[in-house]
Curated annotation (Swiss-Prot):
Catalysis: reaction(s): 2-hydroxy-5-methylsulfanyl-3-oxopent-1-enyl phosphate + H2O = 1,2-dihydroxy-5-(methylsulfanyl)pent-1-en-3-one + phosphate
Gene3D superfamilies documented for this protein: 3.90.1470.20, HAD superfamily/HAD-like
Similarity comment: Belongs to the HAD-like hydrolase superfamily. MtnX family.
CDD domains per UniProt: HAD_Pase
Protein name according to UniProt: 2-hydroxy-3-keto-5-methylthiopentenyl-1-phosphate phosphatase
Its biological purpose: Dephosphorylates 2-hydroxy-3-keto-5-methylthiopentenyl-1-phosphate (HK-MTPenyl-1-P) yielding 1,2-dihydroxy-3-keto-5-methylthiopentene (DHK-MTPene).
Record pathway: Amino-acid biosynthesis; L-methionine biosynthesis via salvage pathway; L-methionine from S-methyl-5-thio-alpha-D-ribose 1-phosphate: step 4/6
Natural source organism: Bacillus velezensis (strain DSM 23117 / BGSC 10A6 / LMG 26770 / FZB42)
GO molecular function: 2-hydroxy-3-keto-5-methylthiopentenyl-1-phosphate phosphatase activity
Pfam families assigned: HAD
Its EC number(s): 3.1.3.87
Listed GO biological process terms: L-methionine salvage from methylthioadenosine
Length: 234
């Protein structure tokens, strides 16, 4: 059976060069955010709790400043635009699943990735301090309080007929990487993939990811079958 590739891609630190939440906190948050960040990285507090409390340190009145800062500070990783063209032209199912917030994820991806292919958290600026809503929280099979739960999103999008490809970099990507058939990893996630013995390839830019995906046997088989079907006489 030829399985259909399904590509799930992180955003912060993967599509972008830096982690946008960390950049934002360094610029605007009081020192208390550092303890929360360390708690998330050490897994002593959940991602949902840590990130929610970090944003709770910021007054909602900063919305315009925060948005302007990220749109100016964030840099898209080399090769991403070509990579999106590659998956689109080949009909490869591709989704962004991000622990980031809609107020910066959507503007940064506008004109590149359709909104219906983006899963992320929602930041509310209605109260004195920023409040985070979690529209893609953990399902009944996950108790990790992930925030935007990548395994739960994957379970909605995937099944046994899918060949799951994960692209990521951080602690928020580890559980999704465990579900993947192939993981493209960098930074923290690369170390975790090595320690857990997961099938993976390192990457620094999306040119490497594109080449790596093109060389996966399962992807080649699916593309051959798809193209053969497209060339059948009607």
């Amino acid at each position: 059976m030829t399985r259909t590739p399904l590509i799930i891609c992180d955003f912060d630190g993967t599509v972008t060069m830096n982690d946008n939440i960390v950049s934002m906190m360094k610029e605007f948050a009081p020192p208390e955010w550092l303890e929360l960040k360390d708690g998330v990285l050490s897994k002593s507090i959940s991602i949902q709790e840590g990130v929610g409390r970090m944003f709770g340190l910021l007054p909602s009145s900063l919305k315009e400043e925060l948005t302007g800062f990220i749109l100016k500070d964030a840099k898209i990783r080399d090769g991403f635009l070509d990579f999106v063209s590659f998956v689109r032209s080949n009909g490869l199912p591709f989704y962004i699943v991000s622990g980031g917030m809609d107020f910066f994820v959507h503007p940064l991806l506008e004109g590149i990735v359709e909104k219906e292919r983006i899963f992320c958290n929602h930041a509310s600026f209605d109260n004195e301090h920023i409040h985070i809503d979690w529209p893609h929280a953990c399902d009944g099979d996950c108790t990790n309080q992930c925030g935007c739960c990548k395994p739960s999103v994957i379970r909605k999008l995937s099944d046994q007929q899918k060949f799951l490809i994960m692209i990521g970099d951080s602690v928020t990507d580890v559980e999704a990487a465990k579900l993947s058939d192939m993981c493209f990893a960098r930074d923290y996630l690369l170390t975790e993939c090595k320690e857990l013995g997961l099938r993976h390839l390192p990457f620094q830019d999306f040119h490497e990811v594109k080449t790596g995906i093109e060389n996966i046997g399962e992807v080649q088989a699916w593309l051959q079958k798809k193209n053969a079907g497209a060339n059948l006489p009607r």
